[in-house]
Amino acid sequence: MSTTAMWLLLAVVIVVILFGSVLYKRTFTTKELALTGVMAALSLVAYLFFRVPFYGGSSFHLGNTFTALTALLLDGVSGGLAGAIGLALADILAGDPGYAVTTFVLKFIIGITCGAVAHKVFKLRELDKHAPGYLAKVIVAAASGLLLNVFTDPFLGYFRNVYIFGQEYTIAKALTKITGGVTFVNSVASTVCVVLLYLALRPALERANRPPKAQKASEPKADK
């Protein structure tokens, strides 16, 4: 596939996902947009400057951490967009627009999955941090999307290698197996980081969103 076709495909993928996001989540607050942007930037930095590359285009990095973390702190759409935008842009800056196509889809899937498990299944926002099983639910919610990526990454990677990069079937199949192993290590390490960061950041975020207490009006002094 030509470079122009890669860019067009990436543009189509972005438009479709953004359109679906708007339909699902019609409004974003200023705080949500700001936090999503910060997490996208952290994803980009974690990938571009703190990664260990492996043969076949895969690499060890913690960029997915901020995708899942945003999904747990906010919601699945915000998490998916943070990871999709940040890590797809990282691929582009690294000179890999072909990888950016599948990256955008894969990271959005991570965010949506983590958000669905955290807020639809476990309803983490409504749980007290001292509730029985709270830590286990946080771990499962974080791991859900990240471990799903262990399977979706090689699957989409196969089609990317064959239909975008034009590689032979046997080569693409071998590369997806290598990617699957590295992705599993990424997922486990990212899950640990997400859980630790979420437990630390959730109380601070709740305090920031809590309306200030109304000050009691001073009682009028009695006339002498």
Residue ranges of model-derived segments:
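Loop-helix junctions at membrane interfaces
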Residues: 1-224
